Amino acid sequence: MKLKEIDRTAMQAWSPAQNHPIYLATGTSAQQLDATFSTNASLEIFELDLSDPSLDMKSCATFSSSHRYHKLIWGPHKMDSKGDVSGVLIAGGENGNIILYDPSKIIAGDKEVVIAQKDKHTGPVRALDVNIFQTNLVASGANESEIYIWDLNNFATPMTPGAKTQPPEDISCIAWNRQVQHILASASPSGRATVWDLRKNEPIIKVSDHSNRMHCSGLAWHPDVATQMVLASEDDRLPVIQMWDLRFASSPLRVLENHARGILAVAWSMADPELLLSCGKDAKILCSNPNTGEVLYELPTNTQWCFDIQWCPRNPAVLSAASFDGRISVYSIMGGSIDGLRQKQVDKLSSSFGNLDPFGTGQPLPPLQIPQQSAQHSIVLPLKKPPKWIRRPVGASFSFGGKLVTFESVAVPLQQGAEQQRRQPVFISQVVTEKDFLNRSAQLQHAVQSQGFIGYCQKKIEASQTEFEKNVWSFLKVNFEEDSRGKYLELLGYRKEDLGQKIALALNKVDGPDVALKDSDQVAQSDGEESPAAEEQLLGERIKEEKQECDFLPSAGGTFNISVSGDIDGLITRALLTGNFESAVDLCLHDNRMADAIILAIAGGQELLAQTQKKYFAKSQSKITRLITAVVMKNWREIVESCDLKNWREALAAVLTYAKPDEFSALCDLLGTRLEREGDSLLRTQACLCYICAGNVERLVACWTKAQDGSSPLSLQDLIEKVVILRKAVQLTQALDTNTVGALLAEKMSQYASLLAAQGSIAAALAFLPDNTNQPNIVQLRDRLCKAQGKPVSGQESSQSPYERQPLSKGRPGPVAGHSQMPRVQTQQYYPHGENPPPPGFIMQGNVIPNPAAPLPTAPGHMPSQLPPYPQPQPYQPAQQYSFGTGGAAAYRPQQPVAPPASNAYPNTPYISPVASYSGQPQMYTAQQASSPTSSSAASFPPPSSGASFQHGGPGAPPSSSAYALPPGTTGTPPAASELPASQRTENQSFQDQASILEGPQNGWNDPPALNRVPKKKKMPENFMPPVPITSPIMNPSGDPQSQGLQQQPSTPGPLSSHASFPQQHLAGGQPFHGVQQPLAQTGMPPSFSKPNTEGAPGAPIGNTIQHVQALPTEKITKKPIPEEHLILKTTFEDLIQRCLSSATDPQTKRKLDDASKRLEFLYDKLREQTLSPTIINGLHSIARSIETRNYSEGLSVHTHIVSTSNFSETSAFMPVLKVVLSQASKLGV
């Protein structure tokens, strides 16, 4: 929107931001002459008064100058804080001179306004810029690569930023960096930009376009990002603005191609980095977003080019542009009306002519009038987005789901005496515009849910307005009826009863139903309408008729002559007498005795018959020869490919009658493709019927889209109705895979769902989206729909972490050995996606108990941490470790050095000789957790010590799970190991059983590689009983809840030495526990809670560790029922395992499935206790749905998403075995 206008052919410069009022200085341009061809030059200062509605700017002062200017800037040097008129006007002359003016003296009318002047440059000075950090520094550029840095405090001698660039060239642009004060950039018309570092006095980088067509006419630094700048090209062949980042200077970061011809100037707003002005030879002034390339505003200009454009430093919404037509225009990017500009033009005409006759006729003219259009105003819209300095008090917008969102600013008093707080309440309303569309969609959804497809199709047939629409729905309806091919034939006009009557008339017979029955026996099954008595009567008549016809055969009782003459008959007789059927057939064919040839060929065998048939068809040229050929030779593809498309009904009828099921769809598709390629629009629409017969949904969508107008919602509804019904028909009646969704169908379904969502039908839109597809548009739309419903996407978790992260300051030293720390309690150390974990050397803080005899905490998250008392070597994580589930693929983890272990919490523990332990053994998991962003906190959850821990890989494997906890409140003697989940079993199984259950490395997680030995089998004594899990009553004789809370955490055996002695540990309740030897160091549990390790600890001799424990009385453990809403999970998973067991033949696979069935009990326990997060529950239900549809690939993808985004401690006990089950089901195809 134009605000002001100055009729000057001049360069321009705005007063600094500190100055008020706002001034605009103009200096006569040296690049062109004005309309009067005047050689005078002047320097003028205008005041910007926006309260004045006129377009004229008030001229404050004029100074006659002897110079014309190529560049003019107004610097804030020596400007006082009050904002009085001061600063310095710096002008670049045409003879290499730089002149400094005092603007305050110009406004005051003084004659001596020149502060200083230097003629240092060669050629005109086209580039000037003031350093915004040190306003006394001014950079200038001219010809011969001359760049000077001027100090306004010492203007006598300038400095150079470095050696001149070679070859010498003109400097067209120069600009100081907006963030770093010693960085300067210059550009030349050759297209090369150079960045100078004044501290080093040399160029640090040169930027150039590879096309060598960039003629730099503009240069500007990013206001906020120090390494980014834009270059503008004035070449009409490459009218672009290139955005460069000096960190990646090999190619432009972004290219703006909004101008049609070369660009003459650019200006970047200091108030909003997303506003970049540009003007070009296409007579456009554009305001673009350099980050996206979008044009935010186009100023209404005339047809003249603008050669200079600048933002107003004080008012960020105002800009000025100097054009070649001798005008400097001031605009606002906030919009407005141009009626004032039109009125000014009218006033000029009136003042010039008045009411005088310009043609000398002597008659006065009537007053000049213009058409009054009071209802229409020329409104110029503002920017597409609000600038950074503006915040809207009110607003409205349509959101996803057809919701209108409005907000307004309301002042709400909080309390008496308190200041009012402005709140912005948001109002959301639903907008519905397509009611008919929603009604038809609801009817379709009801038909799908109720399986009432025949009734739905019948209603559509009755409501059809065209014959083609009626045929389409009739064909769709036939898919749900019996004898669909016969019904298709009837729709094509081939009714069995009518055909029988016509044949009977042709044979001059009246038993039409009999003939119809004969025909139906050959081509289709009978409709079964006649009664059994009628069928017997017809059969009797047929036998009688055949008997009468046989009476006409010649009698075999007379004599006949066997001629062997030389004619054709004699030769045929000789061939027959010698058994040469082939020659006899050839003679018959030569004599055109076709019937004799066929009869003899039948006697000669199938091969001769086939040859004779081919010869017969080659000679016969009747109208139906090719049809008979196709029937006999069963070559229907030739008929479909070669028939006249006007007979497409007959070709389709033949395919419906004779085609085999495996070739039926392909033949229908082929016929439909031929019809679709025809130029006749009527035939193209008939191709839809062929695709319906073939059940090809994708081709139907493509054909319908070409034939029908799909611009309205109701036309899209017509298509979707047919698509949904046909997909259901194919799914119910044909053995085809209908789960695949093509790109075109996905596009239409997403459009349809988007329309439903736009009308507020979120649930319906989600129901119509195909489930089994990975099309990006459908996946994204499903995600939006699920979020619009307020529930997470199936199988996905929220990206927001529910855990608190404890920051670690850089350079913070780790704890010193021998000293204990008491940090804040935390249950999980979590790093959001994309954030790096602490580097090696930073220790993840854990919970440390300073005294072994202190009472144990009751909360599961407050578990003690015990660390080795002496420094340990830093282990490396293994390059490859096996997945948690048996048979799973190996997951690669790069090797990373791990932080050293934390200090010892038990300073009085004696030192163990290294002889009894392996020096390379990974000690505590604290350091390893510090280097793993997804692992649990070292102080919170130790790795499990159950049989499942064998699959964690070699030494250095990160802790796997904190989910190996027992169900709370379970007491009494546990059931047998085979009845418990794998996480609750003890390690008392024989090594043979363990090897049969597990795959991958058979060593325990704590076995050193050097001691990779297989222990000898030992005969178990009769009174041997396996070590009791922590659910035994001996662990909690009094049933106190304090001990029960600890029972939910597993223990991890540490290094065990057979030579070390340990002080007796006590429980919290004071009950001593007399068990096996306890390891020295373990995480999460005190030594008295450790389970026995029958394998032997690392470094310890593998000996007899079997303990003779007195048998305990067994008690039955009662479990809570699984909630009804989650019972489907147990049913689905168990049913899938049973199906896999029934199909599996490999004993190893069966053992895997048996183990998976037992280990899934842990999932069911968590469902009983309702300890799983809702996102994991939703993901499990998604997996169950994929199992029901037998789409195991989708189930595995959901599984992967759950494992990668959820808390590992929640899922590690059951998700690996669930992956095993899904993988085996996919492999077995159950």
UniProtKB/Swiss-Prot annotation:
Biased amino acid composition, Polar residues: 981-995, 1033-1064
Span of the annotated motif ALG-2-binding site motif-2 (ABS-2),: 841-847
PTM-bearing positions, type Phosphothreonine: T1171
SUBUNIT field: COPII is composed of at least 5 proteins: the SEC23/24 complex, the SEC13/31 complex and SAR1. SEC13 and SEC31 make a 2:2 tetramer that forms the edge element of the COPII outer coat. The tetramer self-assembles in multiple copies to form the complete polyhedral cage. Interacts (via WD 8) with SEC13. Interacts with PDCD6; interaction takes place in response to cytosolic calcium increase and leads to bridge together the BCR(KLHL12) complex and SEC31A, leading to monoubiquitination. Interacts with KLHL12.
Residues carrying Phosphoserine: S526, S531, S798, S1173
Free-text note regarding domains: The ALG-2-binding site motif-2 (ABS-2) contains a PXPGF sequence that binds hydrophobic pocket 3 of PDCD6.
Residue ranges, compositional bias (Pro residues): 866-876
Record field: compositional bias (Low complexity): 930-940, 959-975
Matches recorded under InterPro entries: Sec16_Sec23-bd, SEC31-like, WD40/YVTN_repeat-like_dom_sf, WD40_repeat_dom_sf, WD40_rpt
Record protein name field: Protein transport protein Sec31A
Entry keyword annotation includes Repeat: yes
Organism expressing this protein natively: Mus musculus
Subcellular location: Cytoplasm; Cytoplasmic vesicle, COPII-coated vesicle membrane; Endoplasmic reticulum membrane
